[in-house]
Regions:
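Active-site loop-to-helix "anion-binding N-cap" substructures in soluble metabolic enzymes
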Residues: 1-398
Length: 398
């Protein structure tokens, strides 16, 4: 992405910027915003347009409505959005049609208009061209700032871009996401380390395949560990294991060897006699887990080895926890890894955390400010790591 079109190179004076944001935020029982991270992330893009003397028309989805259920209305987020932006936010009860059109026409420079949930219309997720065109009429410049949906070819994220010949670009957040992934996958300072945790080998296979060409070290942790251990003849007791993926695990080890990538798998684990926070536990060799016991976190030797690997590396990608972090007893491996990454980052390494569970872990244990970048897009991040060209990104680059 040598010449990325970003908002920094555009002056939005007297421009109506139609911005696809990702305001798919969790709401509590009172329909108040429970976690405003995604709204805060969109702020720089919105403020840049307003400061230039333009106006903003914001479009987003919220949840997966099947009809126009009021619980999925974006009206619920208006007060939070106003507090974060520090400006009044106008609201349109539909995202297309006369009302939206009128609201957009009356918009003055410096004003912000939020459109109702895009997914109230089935055409959004179908990538309907007519719907995309109707949305495109609301603004004269299109900005995509929604990394969380960049891997979907939806009307507002991809199809709409064709109606803006030159007048389209990436927002701040999306540009940062692309640059961070680029740093790991292409331009990062070596040695490059990827840490993949989580339960299933099957969900990470394509990623592992793609990144073996880009990394020098690969740490495999979490539930995936046991498929690799058992494939090499170890005894994993009752630990989670995908027997049908053992061949694949051996192939990965072979490939890594051929490409000179060092793979690090836990050597010891904290095993439990039950899947519960109050289970009896013992530290055992990863290849000799007793019958009826299961490994639920990595052990002290593994933590020390992983710490050393992390300190050697200059570019670090972390995706997925190393243990069952939902239970305090089995969260220390993940916390230790977070500490190691924080230390390496302080010493000048670039660290990117992304993809579902690891983002939750980083927040839960307070590492958010101690790593270089936390990606907001779960699926989108994973698909980029798999080497896929995301449709939302391709549409702007055209």
């Amino acid at each position: 992405l040598e010449e990325m079109k970003t908002i920094q190179n555009v002056n939005f004076k007297n421009t109506k910027a139609l911005i696809r944001v990702d305001f798919n935020v969790p709401l509590n029982a009172q329909f108040e915003v429970a976690d405003a991270t995604r709204i805060v992330s969109a702020k720089p893009t919105i403020l840049k347009v307003l400061e230039d003397g333009g106006s903003c028309i914001l479009m987003s989805h919220l949840g997966r409505p099947t009809a126009q259920e009021s619980e999925f209305s974006l009206r619920h987020i208006v007060s939070t959005l106003e507090a974060i932006l520090g400006v009044q936010v106008l609201f349109s009860i539909n995202c297309v049609g006369d009302e939206a059109q009128k609201a957009s026409e009356n918009l003055q420079p410096g004003q912000v208009l939020l459109l109702e949930n895009l997914r109230y219309h089935a055409e959004e997720t179908k990538g309907d061209v007519g719907f995309a065109e109707a949305l495109s009429k609301l603004g004269d410049f299109y900005i995509n700032d929604a990394f969380g949906t960049a891997h979907r070819a939806h009307a507002s994220t991809t199809i709409i871009a064709q109606f803006f010949q030159e007048n389209k670009c990436f927002g701040n957040l999306l540009a940062q996401e692309i640059e961070s992934i680029d740093k790991v996958m292409q331009t990062g300072e070596k040695p490059v380390l990827a840490i993949l945790g989580g339960a299933k080998v099957s969900s990470k296979i394509t990623i592992i395949d793609n990144i073996l060409d880009k990394v020098d070290h690969l740490i495999i942790g979490g539930g995936m560990t046991f498929t690799f251990v058992k494939a090499q003849g170890g005894h994993v007791g009752d630990s989670i294991c995908e027997d049908d993926k053992m061949e694949l695990a051996l192939e990965i080890l072979e490939k890594a060897k051929a490409k000179n990538v060092q793979i690090h798998i836990p050597v010891d684990v904290l095993a439990a006699d039950d899947f519960s926070n109050d289970a009896n536990t013992q530290i055992v060799d990863v290849r000799a887990i007793p019958e009826n016991w299961q490994g639920l976190d990595c052990g002290p030797k593994s933590k020390a080895i992983f710490h050393d690997v992390v300190q050697q590396c200059k570019t670090i990608l972390w995706n997925g926890p190393l243990g069952v972090i939902e239970m305090e007893t089995f969260s220390s491996g993940t916390i230790a890894l977070g500490d190691s990454i924080a230390e390496a980052t302080k010493n000048g390494a670039f660290s990117l955390v992304g993809g579902g569970d690891s983002v939750a872990a980083v927040k839960q244990f307070g590492f958010e400010k101690k790593v270089s970048y936390v990606s907001t897009g779960g699926g989108a991040m994973l698909e980029s790591l798999e080497g896929k060209i995301l449709p939302g990104i391709a549409a702007i680059s055209k």
